[in-house]
């Protein structure tokens, strides 16, 4: 869900805002679909189905265009690493966490991705160093993460009945960290067409998850899931992964990386709304407080809030 492309335009038309809102709804829907599916499909098998079906859909979309096959043959090692840190690891961690937490909370924890991206880029790159504003935004985002994880984790340490286990809260955060590494590593794919990069990493991550799912879940022994689960898997793979990537890169081509990154703020509200309407999930006050801290941190990282305040004060 992160990109390192250079910003192209700072002007957002109503059409681009509408597309950005649609993308936020779609990616928020991925947490909803996953919450439905993990009730009947083990996490590793679910990751395999999501990635495999999405990769197939993107290959059908590309139909051999943009040099997809030479790119796969020539850069398969890079695609394997990108697929590992941008798909296989984060998806597996999020789905494992969602066996115990709701769609909304998982989306909020994953919304810390830009915070980790900034911190990792400060060490891993030469051109994206921390500024005072970025550091402040990171602190707010990390504070929001602590608020979200802290109360449940402390209660769990004392054995309170019904509390969410600590690992279920930590795994989505580790998924966000993995996305942060992939954002810096992904810079090496700038010379490829964006759909080729997406198809390449999805193909590679499918190959990574295939032996994991076979050895751990033994999917051939699983009962046939109900129709609602099948539909959730199709929605997760085709809508929230394959189509979302195409939409994401289309917005980025017109609006640039900075504007497109605002989708991170739109994902948790849509996941929370879908979880509330269809799954009966309710957020605690600490969840809302943590989300607001993370949102404030992301707004500072984006930079436009500070620019508006500076302009108003002149």
Role assignments for model-derived ranges:
Residues 2-48, 84, 96, 156-188, ...:
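Glycine-/small-residue-enriched transmembrane alpha-helix faces in small-molecule transporters
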Residues 26-31, 59-110, 145-147, 237-255:
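Specific transmembrane alpha-helical segments of multi-pass solute transporters/efflux pumps
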Residues 29, 33-36, 40, 54-72, ...:
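Membrane-interface helix-cap regions at the ends of transmembrane helices
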Residues 40-89, 114-120, 177-182, 198-218, ...:
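Transmembrane alpha-helices of multi-pass small-molecule transport proteins
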Residues 45-56, 86, 94-133, 145, ...:
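Specific alpha-helical transmembrane segments that line the substrate/conduction pathway
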Residues 49, 87, 105-112, 183-207, ...:
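Helix-helix packing/entry segments at the starts of transmembrane helices
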Residues 58, 80, 112, 120, ...:
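Hydrophobic transmembrane alpha-helices of multi-pass small-molecule transport proteins
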Residues 58, 117-119, 123, 141, ...:
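Transmembrane alpha-helical segments that form core, pore/gating elements
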